[in-house]
Amino acid sequence: MNTEQSAEPHYSNSKCLISTPEGKDLKNGAVKRTPSSKFKRVHSNFKSPLQVPESAKVSPAEEVAELEGRREQLDAEIAQLEVEGCRVEELEHHIDMLHEYNDIKDIGQSLLGRIAAVRGTTTRDLYSHFGLELDD
């Protein structure tokens, strides 16, 4: 089987001359086809749907000042929470417990889905069967 491209011209059924480029010519000489489209420019640059008007653009100095103000506000909130008795370690413990709860809930929902599939019913029916609320 010959894998090289033939440079011989061929005639199609409509008697049009067709030629296949060889080797390097395949990359450079091949005709690129533009896909037909009802839109005007098919090969135009990507244009984001989110347009930022010129008036909304903030200078770097204004952005830094805004961020510093936000940091001061957050520092004040942290200080207030510490005065109220909240500790970072306690917050981290609560976050870890929430992650564990979410993992257990995901496993439970997965099991309910499998049981529903085996029984040929919906998980909604199983929630009522096991005495669970739909928003649990």
From Swiss-Prot:
Component of the swi5-sfr1 complex. Component of the swi5-sfr1 complex, a complex required for double-strand break repair via homologous recombination. This is DNA repair protein SWI5 homolog. It comes from the Eukaryota. Residues 61-92 form a coiled coil. It comes from Anoplopoma fimbria. The keyword Iron-sulfur does not apply. InterPro entries: DNA-repair_Swi5 (IPR010760). Residues 1-43 are annotated as: Disordered. Belongs to the SWI5/SAE3 family. Residues 1-17 have a biased composition (Polar residues). GO terms for biological process: double-strand break repair via homologous recombination. It is found in: Nucleus. One of its GO terms (cellular component) is Swi5-Sfr1 complex. Keywords: Coiled coil, DNA damage, DNA repair, Nucleus.
